[in-house]
């Protein structure tokens, strides 16, 4: 299984700590190798993503932050890539519609409970693994025309 790269961005350290703890519990429970990087500001996250979009598979993003809000951060990320999975985590339910405007996978309301984060993380991990397997298969196999048929050949 692919190592999963996750970013957690929230301006409140207490929420970052809780989410990271839950992700670590999930990682141990399902024996999945997960690397987590944390950010306290949307601009900081966006700067890192602009340098290397492939850096993250999943981003947990607070909506209400002082420098640049989570929705604008997500819009900036979407200008660079449609592939990264974005999950909003916030105290403000009123932003839910905007969250889906940037094709977020989920919208989790604070205070975050493990069962809800586990549900969302499970969906996200399946999507990441599927995309990884699909890309790996595209790189491993080629279609070769044979007479009136096509054969799939393993090139490794």
Protein language model features and the residues they cover:
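CheY-like receiver
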Residues: 47-51, 55-132
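Short, well-ordered amphipathic alpha-helices
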Residues: 17-26, 45-46, 74, 124-125
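Extreme N-terminus of proteins, especially the signal/transit-peptide cleavage junction
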Residues: 1-4, 136-138
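Conserved SAM-binding loop
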Residues: 8, 38, 88-89
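Conserved acidic segment of CheY-like receiver
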Residues: 2-23, 59
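Conserved Asp/Asn-Gly motif in the active-site loop of CheY-like receiver
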Residues: 36-44
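Conserved binding/recognition cores within well-folded domains
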Residues: 120-156
């Amino acid at each position: 299984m692919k190592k999963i790269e996750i970013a957690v961005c929230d301006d409140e350290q207490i929420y970052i700590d809780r989410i990271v703890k839950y992700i670590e519990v999930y990682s141990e429970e399902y024996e999945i190798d997960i690397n987590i990087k944390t950010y306290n500001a949307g601009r900081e996250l966006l700067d890192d993503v602009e340098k290397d979009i492939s850096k993250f598979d999943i981003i947990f993003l607070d909506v209400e932050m002082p420098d640049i809000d989570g929705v604008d951060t997500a819009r900036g990320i979407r200008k660079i890539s449609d592939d990264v999975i974005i999950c909003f985590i916030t105290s403000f339910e009123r932003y839910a519609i905007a969250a889906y405007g940037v094709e977020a996978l989920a919208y989790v309301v604070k205070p975050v409970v493990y069962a809800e984060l586990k549900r969302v993380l499970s969906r996200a991990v399946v999507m990441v693994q599927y995309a990884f397997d699909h890309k790996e298969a595209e790189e491993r196999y080629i279609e070769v025309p044979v007479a009136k048929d096509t054969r799939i050949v393993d090139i490794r």
